[in-house]
Amino acid sequence: MHRWFHNRPRMVSLHLRKGSRRRAAARSIYGPGMTRVSVITGGAGGMGLATARIVGRDHALVLCDVRQDRLDAAAAILKDLDMTATVVNCDVTDRQSVTRLFEIAAGLGTVASVIHTAGVSPSMGDADYVMRTNAVGTVNVNEVFFRTSVEGAAIVNVASMAAHMLPEELIPASQFPLALQDEAAFTAGMSSACNPIPVEGRSGFAYAVSKSFVRWYSTSQAERFNGRGLRIVSVSPGSVDTEMGKLEEQAGAGAMVADFAVPRWGKAEEMAELFAFCVSDKAGYLTGTDILNDGGVIASMRERTRLAAENA
């Protein structure tokens, strides 16, 4: 991943009456002069941008991505919706880059929520790239959030239904705690777990393991986050009709939707509504859990497995 980083982010500000009212609404939540800020990683992608359209109604937005062209396009879309966005070119695998992202967000107001959608699919790179982006990126974003956020803030991490498909014996869960102690040892352990898999399936396996890690992190760290008055949740989407989701259509996701009688692919907007709810005050008691939103694929798989065993 290219480590593009700009100390001076592109600021997109609006001077329209509707935008002013929305900024005033954001300030009123925390009192006079205070702005409620939402950070969305992968904010230029399908689910990230869809979430920004919702959260931006009453939050100042900070979007990050590694592609400036996508950020600029997202900013233009939000501007047309009378929403204010600050865009930051940030590599989530780089802790310093993530720290700078949160510094920028804190400079705009109080960080109330983080929606961590940044990630890559198996078709986008080799196993190490997939693991580093999805797992190490999650640690970086969450640990900086934990260190810098105030009581009442919430974060939602995007996992995947793929994390629910791996047999437990194939998940290197004993290696997961290393992510909080020794990044090099953690990545080495993850590589060792992936290496026995044939090359053609290694990225897919790394993806499932990396998303299993996201689930593990979001549940195992809940007590620690509770200690600072913070909430942490993960959501496991199924096959979603986005640019990244469609990359996997030929690799099996499309066939899976058909095989398990799911009537259609999920929509980015449907995932976004759930993400926005998870970090909202309405979900103030929700933490330390994973929400599977897959159109029933995993339920069908488990029932078919049960029936097959019963009839064997």
Language model: regions and residue ranges:
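Conserved glycine-rich cofactor-binding loop
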Residues: 44-45
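Conserved glycine-rich Rossmann-like NAD(P)H-binding loop of the short-chain dehydrogenase/reductase
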Residues: 58-73
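Rossmann-fold cofactor-recognition segment
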Residues: 78-96
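Catalytic loop of short-chain dehydrogenase/reductase
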Residues: 122-124, 154-227, 239
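C-terminal helical subdomain
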Residues: 140, 199, 206-207, 212-215, ...
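Short, small/polar-rich loop/turn modules that mediate ligand/substrate recognition or access, typified
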Residues: 226, 231, 286-288
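Short C-terminal tail/terminal secondary-structure segment
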Residues: 287-312
